[in-house]
Every structure is written in structure tokens, then in C-alpha cells.
Amino acid sequence: MSAQQSRFTRLPRVPRAIGLVAAAATLALLAAGCTSGGSTGSTGANGYGFNAPAQVKDSGITILVDAGRQAIAEAFKADHPEIKVDIQTYDGNAGGTNSFQTKISLADKANSGWPDVVWSGQVNDASWAAVGKNGAQAFAAPLDEGVTDKGWLDGYTKGAEDPVTVDGHVYGARDNLAPVVFWYNKTLFDQFGYKIPETWEDYQALGDKLAAEHPGYTLGSIGDSFTAVLADMWSAQAPIYTVDGKDFTANFSDDHSKKMIALLDHMLANKSLSLDGLFTPDFPKNSKGKLLGIPGPTWFTGALFQNKDSLDGQPGEWGAGAALHWAGEDTATGNVGGGFWYGSSHSTNLKAVGEFLQYATSGPQSVKLITGLPAYASTASDWLDAQVSGGFWADGDDFKSNVAAAATHIWSGWGATLSFSSEPAWNEVVAPALAKGETIASTVDAWQKRYENDAQVNGYTVK
């Protein structure tokens, strides 16, 4: 996800209830255990089903997190005084920076300095972290080989761990799911007498009506790559990039791709969509009290609606509608982020690593501190119940059912496990054109070519 999720989500607030979804460290300071390089083996070592180093019972662990995940790491440290915990922050691999892989590559070269646990806001890191390279042992430990409690991984929502499952082994613990729903301002919908859209066609028609009757009000923004590409194109089942093993396809001629590009261009033209970045000062300045609705992931709860520095919503003002879909087609939606925790195969205290991973995703503080819909099924159920009982959301029962349903309708045709970030293509090709008043449609050839070039550079065969 998304990058913005990692970078900007603040710990949310819920009035009188459980809280909601919300300086790079140098490798020289990372005090993790280390071994000589080698490939992960199925024969196991030191009690684990892989080539683990000798375990040291009292060895401390280093946890590398972004600002949004620091609270859960601090909670673990407070609740486990018997474990020496060093918490260090970095950008969370946000925005396709590749900082996670860069740090691990440097540690591999030095043969020391690996963190014991790393948070990443991206969903594709298993493509490299679970694979040994140039004689170096794969960084990510297979969690199902003794790191986590037996059977614990079975508690995940179906499909949540698919992006980190490689050759039958699970290499990461998913923090949250980030399915896209339609967020609506109930206060404004009631005031204007509008009906909440159910389809993309409804959404476009509502944009026309809003532009004509209430100029200055909007139905969202595509000022960020993740809103346009992940929230909109993915939700539209637009196959602008798909992967099958090492085969890559960018299909901009598919009807779903063409329809969504036309929809976005149309709504930009009538100004029912803006180009404000959601985490820039312009967004709250221009959108607070004037945003009728927006398609977006579940972590918008804390990042936008319950963030005093953003929309600063009030109880009963915002609700979650069903995921938008094309008329006459099955419901499908996109996913924006929902990052993973990785344990290091080099750690000398894998017991503590496993305890942290389970604590962070399904422990006693996870409902309060996970910044989005938790990926662990029992935690997700408790989180949804907390939203309804907290009283913040309009139409609480609809909130619960619509968010839960969206989590089961994420479109599987998207290239979610792409080994490189898709964000630079939008940021460097499409966004500058839009800033000059050009259309998305006018950039399609260059946009597609950028994806194909990036794919080739990263070892894919372009089909």
C-alpha cells in the first residue's frame, strides 16, 4: 500500500471507545544476530525448519518500524520487560522507495546488522525477501517452520497471507487488509438529498449532478498514485498490470481499463474530482466540509476521517458504503496497502520474534493499534464490533457489513505481487500531464511503455 498508509496514518481516536485505524535508522545501529550467508534449508538447524543460527535465550531483538507501527512495538516492549527490545524507525518502505531491500542488501554484504523484525507497507516484498541471492541466505524466516505457534497462521482471513506464501511456506505476518469501499459524508448526502452510489456508473452520474448543483464540492481526488491506480483502477478490474510468474502484461485496451480512464477524465473535467494530494495541506483546506464521498481503503478511517489534521470528522458524519462495481457485473474491489511484518532468518532469538509477530497482529493491543481492518480473523471481528459500539460511524451496521464484504471481494486479477513499485510510473508520467491540464487518456501509450520498461528491467518477460 500503500506507501501513504505507512507514511501518514496517525493513531486514530474514537470518542469514549477503542481507538481506530491509523528518520531512517542506520544499519550500524541494528543489533540483530548474524550468521554466514547460505540458502534456507529444509533440513533445519537449531530447532527450526530452516538454517537458523544458534539461538541465544536472552538475546535482544531489533524491531524496524515506520511511525504508524511504532505504538504496537512500544506496547510489546512494555508488556514484555523480559525481552530486550530496540525499536528503530524508518520510512516503512513507503512510496516504492525500496528502502527495506536496500537495508537488507547492505547487511548481507557486511554479513551483520540484520534487524530481527521489519515492518513493510508494501505487499510484494516476499518476491525477494524469501529468496536467497548471490550466496546470501534469504532474509525472511519461514514462519511456519517453528517461528510462530503451530496453527496460529490458520487464524488469518482467507487469502490474507497469499502474497507472502512461497513454495508452500509463509514468510510474513500480515498486519491489516485494505479493501476499498465507498466512504460517504452522510451529513452532506442528507442535506443534498442524494442517494449513495452503488455502481461506477452511479458514481459518475453523481459527479455530474454535484458539479452542476454544488460546484466546489467533490467526490474524491486522484492527486496520489495510490488513489488513481489502486483504489480506482484495481477496483474497476482494469488489468493495467498483471503478472503470471515472470510474465508481465499491461493491458490498457481492456474495456475495464478504458472505462475507468474515461470516467476519471470526465470527473476531472467537471471538477467533481480534484488533484489535491490527500496528505498535503491543500486537501483538508479544500475538502473539509466539501467532500461528499471518496472511494478508498479501510485505513482512511484514521488517516482522514478521524485525523484532526485532515478532515477531522465528527461522530455520525461519515459512513462506509459498499464497494463500487460496474453495473451488471459481480462486485470486485481493490486493495491499498495492508503491509506485513517479517522475521529475520538471521535472528538469534526467534522465540521473541515469533512472540512479537503474534502480539502485533492478534495480541491484546492489536484491535486498538492496528491502523486498518486487521488481517487476523478474530482481531478483525473484534475491530468491526468496536467500530459499531464506538458510535463514531454513521449507519454502524452498514459500516460493519460493507467493510467485511469488501475484504472478501478483492479482485484477484491484479498484479499485486509485482516485484517493483507501480507508483513511479504514475508519478513521473501521468501526474505531470494532469498538472498541465492534459488527460489521462493522452498518457496511456507512455504510461504502458513505462510499466513494460520497468518490468523488463526487473526480469519479467513482457507479453
Region roles according to the model:
Residues A126-K133, T157-I196, I222-K246, N335-S344, ...:
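Periplasmic solute-binding protein
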Residues N335, D397-Y451:
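C-terminal capping/gating helix-and-loop segments adjacent to ligand/active sites or protein-protein/ligand interfaces
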Residues G207, K246-G277, A323:
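Glycine-centered hinge/linker elements that transmit conformational signals in sensory
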Residues A78-Y156, Q191-K195, K285, K290-G293, ...:
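Extracytoplasmic "Venus flytrap"/periplasmic binding protein-like
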Residues A129-A141, D167, L304-G328:
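Ligand-binding "clamshell"
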Residues K258, M267-S272, D309-A375:
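Extracytoplasmic/periplasmic substrate-recognition and gating elements
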Residues V65-K84, Q88, W426:
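Short, polar/charged alpha-helical segment
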Residues M1-G60, A78, E452-K463:
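Short, low-complexity disordered leader/linker segments with a strong preference
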